[in-house]
Amino acid sequence: MADEKSTGKRGHTSRRNFIAGTGLAAVSAPFYARSADNPSGDTRNCVDESERAKRIATAPKAPFDSIRDYMAALDAHGLLLRVPEIDQDEYQMTALMFRATDEYGFFESPAFMYDKVKIDGEWINGPVVGNFQGHVNTDCIAFGLEPDPHDIKVSYRRAKAHMNKLLDSTEDGRWPEIAPVELGRDEAPCKEITLSGDECDLTKFAFVKTNPADAGRYVNTGSVFTSDPELGNNFGTYRCEITGPRTLRINSEKNHAGYKMLLAARERGEKVGHVSIAVGQDPIIWLLSGAPLARQRGDGAVDELAIAGGMRGKALEVVKSDTSEMLVPAHAEMIIEGEVPLDAPLQTEGPFGEMFGYLGPQKQAVFWMNVTHITHRRDPWLMNSFTGMQRGYTTSPVEVLYERIMRRSIPNLIEFHYPQDMMGVSFVSIDKTAPGQGLEVGRTVANRVSICKVVVVVDADMDVLDRTQMLFTMGSRWQPDPATEIIPKGRGNITDPSSIVQGETSKIVIDATMQWPEEGGPANYAKRNRALLEELAPDALAQAHASFGEALRLWGKS
């Protein structure tokens, strides 16, 4: 993460210059307080920290019941850019997301709110929000922690410490649970407006076609709720292609619980599967919907709504679907209900721009859905995922869970990181205690985590969140022979564009730890210059920071 904007690398562009360069200077005023001392409206770098603190103090606090409260908190932290109108027929939303990533990277780009979007020649009222969990500081904000305004690595590790605390709070080391609370229909905000039958028309809402090569417009952030007598209730984020005013094609992969539930219902001879799709979710429901957190190997039925409550520290308010018994988040912006014809032929879906940043292939056989009922809040807020251009969700809970699982077989593991802007690459730090341990650890990680195609193992003195340190240690400590192992065939990610067989990949383990003499390394490994500075002049770094740190931080920000 350290190669992003916070370090001043990559020819840093100030937020003021970025806004001016994209033609948004006039539209950012509602969300960035300007002053003579802060003409850019950048609340993170504002000299007057009291104004920033005041905005944060008066903003909604976690646990957030709605996406509206959560976005208000992002705004208070200076992480939101509002655009009154944008032409998605010209793919301006998509282009702006790419531009933001060009300037700020995956980890420090703002969230966006588009009030009105041009789609298929018509201006449709939103708002539509994007990149809502892209910035690393959202890992703190979503869970009620205050991020460090100057160091995203500090923020990220603060969030990871909170996740470990949550897991430590239970006897079995799993996420805590608080059972949901069911509201009456008239109490649920998601039931403010009701559409039924022919009144339902998904094309009237601001669901967009994200990429020019995508198959069409998508509901690509919906939490798809399904139910099964053995597996229980489930919700997962499966993109849904809009193929008509009242039809959706549901891209749930064969390993997803939603697909397994619909398939099981068909095998039982059922003719119809009931589905409810929640759109505009609170940040914890969104996280659980898209991240591999709730279900671990060997789990049977899992109450994901209770896990959401446990992670929030407060029971989730739910309401019964109008056309089925499924419980859905009461504060969601929209609930799309419908029926999956289980006795009908499956349909094609896609193509769609995937998370590796490449166009994925068309799927040949997916379940599809007839939309029979829609309820929503007045003027619903919709979310759009710019897949492959942004960090999709807060990743600290996932990395902490992986670390705890892997420590069962790697007790000396220090930290694990798989950066979302380098899909397929992962970094692992260990407290090395024996020769051969680097390759052994890397092999374990590669076999356990399918997304890890390139596994780099480093010593304890290297920071896996610091991209520069990772490249430095590969250049200075790694000897390709013998500190490399190729795994010819392993479990891969199904969206990897380089895979010949979907879900399979070769892998490489790179042992970038200091090689011991028993491994063919030097008898006496030279010390790093920085380590010698810390050893021989132990006060130098602290003195430099105290005297010049603020000037260095502000350099290039105006």
Which residues are covered by each model-predicted region?
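N-terminal secretory signal peptides
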Residues: M1-S14, N38-G41
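Helix-centric, low-specificity signal for extended rod-like, repetitive segments
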Residues: G8-K9, D37, D48, G232
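N-terminal export leaders
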Residues: S14-T22, V27
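Intrinsically disordered, low-complexity segments enriched in polar/charged small residues
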Residues: A20-G21, P39, G244
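Boundary at the C-terminal end of the N-terminal hydrophobic targeting segment
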Residues: A33-S35
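Extended, highly charged
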Residues: N45-W368, T372-S558
